[in-house]
């Protein structure tokens, strides 16, 4: 599988004007979070919070500038190919965590089925990269890369 972690961290670095001294929240299975954790630590992030699921993360949101939401293994598609479950990180959860926020919150939704409600991107302090946004801006793997993985 084409690994996009370095590109995602690079985009976050550019959008936030650097990662040093900032804080992040990684949401998803531990094995998926580990590469992002390593890359963010290498970039000298001050705090890296981690959670298996987005439940109860609104209390952490005021303390972070970056959220990376990864695919959760128990999500599945319905017969039409869409998500059979609603987005896990709702706009309401994000709005609660962004009350009185003065700095931007950058959110990357890395779940192909979309784990972050798109309405969250309309909140004044939120910049949301949806799976579709990432497909458009990140380099696509070549056939050679796909065969090698």
Name the predicted role of every residue range.
Residues 88-95:
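Amphipathic helical hotspot of TIR/SEFIR-family domains
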Residues 36, 90, 111:
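Conserved sugar-transfer catalytic core signal across GT-A, GT-B, and GT-C glycosyltransferases
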Residues 1-81, 86:
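Hydrophobic, well-ordered beta-alpha structural blocks that scaffold small-molecule cofactor pockets
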């Amino acid at each position: 599988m084409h690994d996009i972690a370095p590109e995602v961290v690079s985009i976050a670095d550019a959008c936030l004007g650097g990662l040093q001294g900032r804080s992040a929240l990684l949401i998803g299975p531990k094995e998926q979070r580990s590469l992002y954790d390593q890359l963010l630590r290498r970039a000298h992030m001050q705090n890296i919070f981690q959670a298996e699921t987005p439940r109860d993360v609104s209390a952490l949101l005021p303390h972070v500038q970056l959220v990376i939401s990864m695919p959760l293994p128990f999500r599945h598609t319905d017969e039409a190919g869409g998500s059979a479950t609603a987005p896990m990180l709702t706009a309401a959860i994000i709005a609660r965590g962004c009350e009185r926020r003065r700095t931007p919150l950058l959110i990357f939704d890395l779940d192909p089925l979309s784990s972050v409600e798109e309405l969250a991107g309309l909140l004044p302090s939120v910049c949301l990269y949806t799976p579709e946004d990432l497909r458009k801006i990140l380099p696509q793997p070549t056939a050679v890369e796909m065969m090698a993985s």
